Amino acid sequence: MAISKGAINVRSIFIGGEEPCICAPVVGVDAEQVLAETRQISAKKPHLIEWRADFFNGIHDDRQVVATAKEIRTIAGDIPILFTVRSEREGGRPIPLTEEEKMRLFETVCQSGAIDLLDYELVHEPYVATVRQLSRQYGVRLILSYHNFDFTPAKEELVAKMRQAGKYGADIAKVAVMPKSLQDVLVLLQATEEARQELPIPLITMSMGGLGAITRLAGGLFGSAVTFAVGQQSSAPGQIPIEEVKDVLSVIMKYSQ
């Protein structure tokens, strides 16, 4: 059974197809670290690599970002690259860019041909249409995301966030929340299943931290098309090493058909 109603093809992979994809983050602070991490992660063959550019100390320099993105592209080969500049309010590093400056950076990076997917946060609603337009212009898939590192909102609110992402033209909707109890974990999974039944786009969902670890392993059964795993360094609480995620997913998918 397909994870999503509407799987999308990105290079050599299908997101939302028969099996969940594994995405490994790159969080180096300079080009040397970023490229070293990319080499190490690429050797582990994840389905996707996410460059968390908010960790990059050259984020203010478009030319440096593009040059590094192109080198990541070369090293990664046919592995799709997700470009993310996470805001501080949603768990990222502080960066010296306004939203207007981010728009310029996104257009430059998308135009370079070095990336395949772009993550942007729903909270920046006035800029979502601009990001949607430029991502389409350059053939880059758009993930519209919502992160809450404080608590897990009600199921209805989580479904509404994913619905909002779809309404704004996202290719993929993403929700990541922090649980305070196992009940919160169940809320996230229930929201994922409900949104999967309703929306025609792939979903990425997770409950963070140790309590939510099960969602990173079994989330695909409920409709989460991508799980984030540690390739070299973690970018969020509760991420599990890629080798262990691969082992567990292979067992789950084998016996859940």
From Swiss-Prot:
Q: Which pathway is it part of? A: Metabolic intermediate biosynthesis; chorismate biosynthesis; chorismate from D-erythrose 4-phosphate and phosphoenolpyruvate: step 3/7
Q: Which CDD domains match?
A: DHQase_I
Q: What is its EC number?
A: 4.2.1.10
Q: Where is 3-dehydroquinate annotated to bind?
A: 50-52, 86, 216, 235, 239
Q: Which reaction does it catalyse?
A: 3-dehydroquinate = 3-dehydroshikimate + H2O
Q: Which GO terms describe its biological process?
A: 3,4-dihydroxybenzoate biosynthetic process; amino acid biosynthetic process; aromatic amino acid family biosynthetic process; chorismate biosynthetic process
Active site positions: 147, 174
Keywords of this protein's UniProt record, alphabetized? Amino-acid biosynthesis, Aromatic amino acid biosynthesis, Lyase, Schiff base
Pfam families per record: DHquinase_I (PF01487)
Superkingdom, taxonomy of origin: Bacteria
Among the GO molecular function terms of this UniProt record, one is: 3-dehydroquinate dehydratase activity
User: What does this chain do?
Assistant: Involved in the third step of the chorismate pathway, which leads to the biosynthesis of aromatic amino acids. Catalyzes the cis-dehydration of 3-dehydroquinate (DHQ) and introduces the first double bond of the aromatic ring to yield 3-dehydroshikimate.
Give the UniProt family note: Belongs to the type-I 3-dehydroquinase family.
Record's subunit section = Homodimer.
Q: What is this protein called?
A: 3-dehydroquinate dehydratase
Q: Which organism is it from?
A: Geobacillus thermodenitrificans (strain NG80-2)
Write the gene name: aroD
